[in-house]
Amino acid sequence: VAAPTAPPNATTPAPAPSTPAPPQRSPFTLPNVPPPHARSAQPGDGEWKPVPEVGETEGQPLALLTTLHPHPIRKDVEVVVIAFDLTRSELLWVAGAKEPESKTASPEKRKGMVPARDHDRLLAAFNGGFMAKHGRYGAMLDGAEFVPPREGACTVGITKPGGVRVAPWEEIAAAKAELAAWRQTPPCLLHDGQPHQSVRHD
């Protein structure tokens, strides 16, 4: 069934240009995590809840938080986990003013501050990473290599389009030209769904 066409001599207004609707993104939800130990578990453990301080967009929270008690007995030992929706936000790395120590990276690459252009959209900031002398774990930002990469080291790679990949260096090295930044740590605690062989788990 179609609408009738206009007579040949009729004046038909040009249709307004249509703007395609933006693709619908999935709601940001995560499956609850079973508490590791019933004896030390507390109410709400493993249940993901929005983080109000981070805010929301498109009616969806930008971050979710849960708490777990990993000790079999002690209830005062807790781990707080925050997950960000990377389809609605992005991860940026800013080099410290002194770390990672490097003799090759330009001082212009290491101001140790969040750039002013990012202040209005900043959701959260955290400080982390090993000092260069503690393992010589690699780091690179915008083409400037502060410390060369180490084989076997867990690498957080930020792609030029803004994606994030976490994997051992040997799985990322082939695509390093596509990365805007990367930072390394000791071996990944979890990779491909499996804990590292040195991690104790019950």
What are these regions (language model features)?
Residues 1-147:
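Zymogen propeptides
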Residues 126-195:
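Active-site-adjacent helix-turn-beta-strand microarchitecture at beta-sheet edges
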Residues 1, 193-202:
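Short, intrinsically disordered, charge-balanced linker/junction segments flanking boundaries
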Residues 96-99, 170-174, 202:
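A short, sequence-level motif marking secondary-structure junctions
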